[in-house]
């Protein structure tokens, strides 16, 4: 077995197993040595060619706002806008300034220890309404997992994103091309998602999944955890809006491609400052 390691602001590394308990650093030829703020990885054969392809979740190697980046802010058409090198990282929503993350990276395995970076805007990735992406999402990514969510034997992809950036769910069409799941399939999102895992928790033959966040189990502590980001109004008739809440979310599959969010009903909405989760049979029942 070989070894992939992500790094924050340093090249992600590939170590090839020499077969004698030693490893050779093959990063220079692997094609994955970017310097983003990588937080985790997921592997699956998305194009059915017999080798594992690679998804790298990126957050941000540095914070533009906290590390003192110089911003060029102008007012255009009565709206505040950031220009220059940080235009993609810093955006105004209303009069509030928000810092976005770095784009995730999706690599196809060439089968010889090297990887080819996929372009987000090459029509391989489509929005939920079928339009090709024109630029990558810049989310604050923390975790990703491949799972066949719709039973077509092709690995789909779920990404848990921190902060206000929405979680992403990509459905594989079987050829390694992806389309965002309909917002009507997943109606509720966690606000600062940290980790995700899948399992069939009710034995109905369909995978369910759990996303962890940071809500305290103590009522007193919850009162000190209120965020400062103001709420946003939802226009009448906007039925595709997915509200984000500061708590865990448990998604139970209905069997028709949609999910019921049951964290409060199931008693798992709060688990303190949680970073990851995993399903396993602890009591052997």
Which ranges hold each PLM region?
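Acidic, glycine/proline-rich Ca2+-coordinating loop motifs
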Residues: 1-285
């Amino acid at each position: 077995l070989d070894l992939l390691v992500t790094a924050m602001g340093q090249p992600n590394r590939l170590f090839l197993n020499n077969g004698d308990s030693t490893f050779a650093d093959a990063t220079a030829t692997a094609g994955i040595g970017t310097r983003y703020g990588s937080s985790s990885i997921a592997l699956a054969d998305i194009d059915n060619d017999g080798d594992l392809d690679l998804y790298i979740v990126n957050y941000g190697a540095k914070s533009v706002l906290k590390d003192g980046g110089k911003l060029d802010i102008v007012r255009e058409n009565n709206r505040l806008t950031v220009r220059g090198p940080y235009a993609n990282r810093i955006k105004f929503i209303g009069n509030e300034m928000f810092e976005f993350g770095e784009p995730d990276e999706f690599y196809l395995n060439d089968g010889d220890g090297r990887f080819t970076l996929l372009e987000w805007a090459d029509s391989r990735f489509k929005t939920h309404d079928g339009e090709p992406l024109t630029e990558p999402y810049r989310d604050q990514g923390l975790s990703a997992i491949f799972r066949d969510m719709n039973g077509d034997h092709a690995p789909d992809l779920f990404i848990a994103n921190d902060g206000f950036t929405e979680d992403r769910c990509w459905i594989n069409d079987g050829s390694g091309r992806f389309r965002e799941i309909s917002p009507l399939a997943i109606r509720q999102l966690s606000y600062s998602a940290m980790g995700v895992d899948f399992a069939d928790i009710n034995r109905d033959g369909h995978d369910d999944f759990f996303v962890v966040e940071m809500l305290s189990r103590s009522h007193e502590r919850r009162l000190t955890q209120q965020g400062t980001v103001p709420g946003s109004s939802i226009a009448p008739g906007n039925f595709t809006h997915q509200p984000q809440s500061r708590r865990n979310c448990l998604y139970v599959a209905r069997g028709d491609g949609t999910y019921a969010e049951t964290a409060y009903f199931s008693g798992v909405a709060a688990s303190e400052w949680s970073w990851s989760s995993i399903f396993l049979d602890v009591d052997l029942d």
